[in-house]
């Protein structure tokens, strides 16, 4: 089954794609190839981009983070979160964080995917995305 034409991408996927030692690296690479063949467009947020750059920098080094910034970030559609999105994400975080390991970044991604991107399918290795009821393909 081919990938959808539009996909939301989470930090967990970006990290796996960039870091050869990540347990999900091979799967991420296969999905990236499939997305290229099908001309899928990637969407993310600036918060996911920030989280990814920081994670790459601290866990894999500056080179990896700089490659991501140079080669990947310019090719991705940025879903820009406004104050209403941030307020909704904060409410999701307040409701779920006490009983679930949930980051604010994932709460904001949930709001963006559901309210801005029409419940778009996601590329993520983060279990939180499935737990939130999002459609996860990776």
Residue ranges and their predicted role:
Residues 1-6, 110-138:
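Acidic, PIN/NYN-like endoribonuclease modules and their adjacent C-terminal/linker elements
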């Amino acid at each position: 089954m081919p990938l959808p034409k539009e996909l939301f991408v989470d930090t967990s996927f970006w990290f796996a794609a960039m870091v050869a030692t990540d347990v999900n690296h091979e799967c991420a690479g296969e999905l990236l190839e499939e997305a290229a063949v099908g001309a899928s467009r990637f969407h993310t947020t600036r918060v996911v981009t920030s989280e990814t750059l920081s994670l790459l920098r601290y866990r894999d080094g500056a080179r990896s983070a700089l490659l991501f910034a140079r080669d990947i970030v310019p090719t991705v559609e940025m879903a820009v979160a406004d104050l209403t999105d941030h307020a909704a994400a904060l409410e999701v975080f307040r409701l779920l964080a006490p009983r679930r390991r949930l980051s604010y970044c994932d709460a904001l991604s949930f709001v963006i995917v559901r309210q801005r991107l029409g419940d778009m399918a996601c590329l993520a290795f983060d279990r939180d995305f499935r737990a939130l009821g999002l459609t996860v393909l990776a």
